């Protein structure tokens, strides 16, 4: 698949996206959650969850700190916000740390995909809670995406993700360097695609999207390069559109493998995970391009959110016909 053209790859992503059928019920096209959002950071989980919603998942949740939850609820009534997380200093006298963790972990049974990290921060209890979420997600076979301070978990506790083929890491250049250092990979040797492959292999086959002028996507055995045109403004928060897009595409991937519609194709899980990563990258880059064309140097992360659906139509396209079950 590494030698496939952009057109070929996006056609496969198209094949993985469910059509819109009357027979589907609420939740079948994706139940995703973003775990993050703390006192200081409320925008990131919102941007991620809204990208998931705008790309078409049925149910988009945010699991966050109460202080963040009250704010995020005012951003959009379309998101389901659960203030179950706690920063260490905000644990109430009548609250038990283990019960806080278990309440978050209990949400997993309702979800198809989890994004961990947007607005999370590095508070120990927040990090420890997410560590337990990762362990339980692996047990249940739930795909997850790590970004921002979720990547700090992969850096400081690599055993949490080692060997997990249902995990996507989305580091920028600085975060990539930290992960490489944690795994003893020399970032000064080799070209970017080789380094991405080497780091993915060092983590035992996780999928890494190394964000940059080009996005390098690798699981250690195959590498894809996403180099569609993006915008020139590097405002913070654009990576949250990527994580949200990945979440919905991973949910569509589950629908594909569950065969909730007759798609007539038979791609392997390793291939569809790579395709979800590639599709998410392409959609995000298209969002950036569209938003930059409209806003120029004033572009902010929120501007990408409004272009998610158009980017999907431009890059992947809607099903022209709705096949029968």
From Swiss-Prot:
The keyword NAD applies. Residues 9-315 form the YjeF C-terminal domain. (6S)-NADPHX binds at residues 119, 172-178, 240. Its EC number is 4.2.1.93. InterPro entries: Carbohydrate_kinase_pred_CS (IPR017953), CARKD (IPR000631), Ribokinase-like (IPR029056). The keyword NADP applies. It catalyses: (6S)-NADHX + ATP = ADP + phosphate + NADH + H(+); (6S)-NADPHX + ATP = ADP + phosphate + NADPH + H(+). Coiled coil: none annotated. GO terms for molecular function: ATP binding; ATP-dependent NAD(P)H-hydrate dehydratase activity. ATP binds at residues 211-215, 230-239. It is found in: Cytoplasm. Gene3D superfamilies: 3.40.1190.20. Catalyzes the dehydration of the S-form of NAD(P)HX at the expense of ATP, which is converted to ADP. Together with NAD(P)HX epimerase, which catalyzes the epimerization of the S- and R-forms, the enzyme allows the repair of both epimers of NAD(P)HX, a damaged form of NAD(P)H that is a result of enzymatic or heat-dependent hydration. Belongs to the NnrD/CARKD family. This is ATP-dependent (S)-NAD(P)H-hydrate dehydratase. It comes from Phaeosphaeria nodorum (strain SN15 / ATCC MYA-4574 / FGSC 10173).
């Amino acid at each position: 698949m590494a030698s496939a053209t952009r057109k070929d790859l996006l056609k496969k992503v198209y094949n993985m996206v469910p059509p819109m059928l009357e027979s589907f019920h609420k939740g079948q096209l994706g139940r995703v959650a973003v775990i993050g959002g703390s006192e200081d950071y409320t925008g990131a989980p919102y941007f991620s969850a809204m990208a998931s919603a705008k790309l078409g998942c049925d149910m988009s949740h945010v699991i966050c700190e109460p202080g963040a939850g009250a704010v995020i609820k005012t951003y959009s009534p379309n998101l389901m916000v659960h203030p179950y997380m706690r920063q260490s200093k905000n644990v109430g006298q009548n609250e038990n740390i283990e019960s806080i963790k278990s309440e978050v972990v209990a949400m997993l049974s309702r979800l198809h995909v989890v994004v961990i990290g947007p607005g999370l921060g590095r508070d120990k209890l927040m990090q420890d809670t997410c560590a337990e979420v990762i362990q339980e997600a692996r047990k249940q076979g739930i795909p997850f995406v790590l970004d921002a301070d979720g990547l700090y978990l992969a850096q400081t506790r690599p055993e949490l993700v080692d060997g997990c083929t249902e995990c996507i890491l989305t580091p920028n250049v600085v975060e990539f360097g930290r992960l490489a250092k944690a795994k003893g990979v020399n970032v000064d040797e080799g070209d970017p695609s080789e380094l991405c492959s080497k780091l993915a292999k060092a983590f035992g086959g996780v999928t890494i999207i190394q964000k940059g002028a080009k996005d390098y996507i690798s699981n250690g055995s195959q590498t894809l390069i996403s180099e569609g045109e993006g915008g020139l403004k590097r405002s913070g928060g654009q990576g949250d559109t990527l994580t949200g897009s990945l979440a919905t595409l991973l949910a569509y991937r589950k629908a594909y493998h569950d065969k909730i519609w007759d798609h007539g194709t038979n791609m392997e899980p390793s291939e569809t995970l790579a395709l979800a990563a590639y599709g998410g990258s392409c959609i995000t880059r298209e969002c950036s391009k569209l938003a930059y064309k409209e806003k120029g140097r004033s572009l902010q992360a929120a501007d990408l959110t409004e272009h998610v659906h158009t980017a999907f139509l431009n890059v992947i396209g809607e099903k022209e016909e709705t096949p029968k079950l």
